[in-house]
Amino acid sequence: MDSCRMTTEVILHYRPYENDPKQLAKIAENVIQDFPTHPLPRFIPWFPYDESKLPLKPERLPPVISEEAAESVKQYLAISEPGVKSQSYDCTVDLLEFQPSSKLQHFIQSHTVKEQTNAAHLDKNSGKEKQHKQRSWSVSLASSHCPEKIFPLSRKLQASLRTLHLHSFHRARWTLEYSVCNNQTLEDIWTKLNRLIRRDELPSCNATIQRQLGQIWVFCDIKCCEYVGNLLKERLSLIGKIDLFVHKYGVIFSM
């Protein structure tokens, strides 16, 4: 009687410095060993159980699928799903430590040259960057002083606050876009705005420039928003309408 033997193919990836044949063979043997299993104890229900009388019975019988229907489903799946060719999976692709030493050395050299080039470029432009450093945020100092020129909020804005149940200390933001800059660049507006904030002329304000969006956001308390909006339009020579935006509510006011 012929005995059947089942062979198992093992592909072992190892690092260049882990090339001991004995250790590699031992690792491969440990991998293909069967995991130890423990037989589960027989389940004994803690409730009265009778196989002939099930406590729960379905109202309807399970659906019966004929062989013809099953075959048609198989054909449909074979047509609709593209055939996937079986290919060996190599988990070491694109991993640098498993690459040949020649490729590794070339990568290290090219990476070093790139870093040196970038460092030289940064040193060359360091003087320019120190002269013109782009700021993204401008924050005013905390001050309890409130300008006397702040008038009560307009009826339209008060009605919006009552409808949305917003407090007068809720934060809002004015959105300044290029369309209201009146032939000025966004950077010019940003420079002028920073001066106003540093001089504490805009109460409770902080601002940020979103260069990728082409916008400047000026945050303030709602109680000061109309005063801030009028001051922005006057001191920055803005034209058109600017929108007051509140998080989760969108634009609630324009002027």
Curated annotation (Swiss-Prot):
Residues 33-88 are annotated as: Sufficient for interaction with MAD2L2. Its main location: nucleus. Residues 116-135 are annotated as: Disordered. InterPro entries: Shieldin_RINN1. GO terms for cellular component: chromatin; nucleolus; nucleoplasm; site of double-strand break. Keywords: Chromosome, DNA damage, DNA repair. It is found in: Chromosome. One of its GO terms (biological process) is telomere maintenance in response to DNA damage. Component of the shieldin complex, which plays an important role in repair of DNA double-stranded breaks (DSBs). During G1 and S phase of the cell cycle, the complex functions downstream of TP53BP1 to promote non-homologous end joining (NHEJ) and suppress DNA end resection. Mediates various NHEJ-dependent processes including immunoglobulin class-switch recombination, and fusion of unprotected telomeres. Component of the shieldin complex, consisting of SHLD1, SHLD2, SHLD3 and MAD2L2/REV7. Within the complex, SHLD2 forms a scaffold which interacts with a SHLD3-MAD2L2 subcomplex via its N-terminus, and with SHLD1 via its C-terminus. Interacts with ASTE1. This is Shieldin complex subunit 3. It comes from Mus musculus (Mouse).
